[in-house]
């Protein structure tokens, strides 16, 4: 009798698994999909007690929550989801059984559509958890030796359902995350070399980092438009700027802004004569590119200076006043451009960069108003923060915000898979922190 019931149960819930899989595929367009490792959920209050190291070649250390199921069982989250589900059921009933004015119906329909993905996932999590409870109950009655095969089959099925549940947990948590309204923006990327004794090491490193982002843009099929480029001796780079356009550019590059440090024995330049390890820095600034409607610059607020271009560049250098300097009087921001031969084009580029910097100030002000007292795990997001070290002598890149290490610097500087993996980890860490923020701030009233 037990055997017959178990076979019937397994058949029914194998169908359930297929339904779960179809559901995730069917609703994937409604939710932001970011691959998540369920072992890496951060819980701030445990950050100084539990350390986890991923078991792969390029290991990453971080503080973590033990399991998504523990996060799901958080009383505040359970209460929050129960209330949302009740609200969804009420709205569903109203839309189907109660007459309302056109304006009220439109408002109800909009809210109903917002809650629908959450309600469906919540229901399927409950069904899957109930399925596991039924399976475990049946397994307890299978103690005979001749039913060992059925026990193994049941345990295998339990593991499959548990994996589906974890997938649904991740999908639910993703749907709860606040969406960054600037993620789809294009960006203005600026790089500037630092200063050291024999500063050629910083200038060479700046060129390598700029080339890395140009290669990454090609890897992601983005458009890379050079705005400014000031070369240095020995193939180095003083300063450069570019506009990068494409899908979700700011989302992927927003955590690249900050101080990048290099440790190496220089191969060229004055510093190479000493044959010892030198340390240098360069800075990266990532500015979301605004539309003209987002930032309006009053011509009365600008002071425009023209001067002769410097450096290599052809006959126009040091002969015509083609270079342009814009000073935004209210904020004191200064932007220069001498990339083009035409003064008009240089003015257009400088104005574009100025708008981006003003837009960044608006964004930072907005974030300061929304941000809690606790800093994000991925850092303060300040452009002056040291975020990463490139140690050439040890062939290692370390991101200090998430204690992420990767070997093979040359491959990393190619700006392809290795860099993309690190960027995905940074996005993942930000999402983990956002979930913690959500629980601590929005659900703290629930006991």
From Swiss-Prot:
The gene is MTRF1. Keywords: Methylation, Mitochondrion, Protein biosynthesis, Transit peptide. One of its GO terms (biological process) is mitochondrial translational termination. Belongs to the prokaryotic/mitochondrial release factor family. The GGQ domain interacts with the peptidyltransferase center (PTC) of the large ribosomal subunit to trigger nascent chain hydrolysis. GO terms for cellular component: mitochondrion. This is Peptide chain release factor 1, mitochondrial. A motif (GGQ) lies at residues 313-315. Residues 1-63 form a transit peptide. It comes from Bos taurus (Bovine). GO terms for molecular function: translation release factor activity, codon specific. Residues 299-363 are annotated as: GGQ domain. Its main location: mitochondrion. It holds the Pfam family PCRF. The modification N5-methylglutamine is found at residue 315. It is found in: Mitochondrion. Mitochondrial peptide chain release factor that directs the termination of translation in response to the peptide chain non-canonical stop codons AGG and AGA. Non-canonical termination codons AGG and AGA are found at the end of MT-CO1/COX1 and MT-ND6/ND6 open reading frames, respectively. Methylation of glutamine in the GGQ triplet by HEMK1 is conserved from bacteria to mammals. It comes from the Eukaryota.
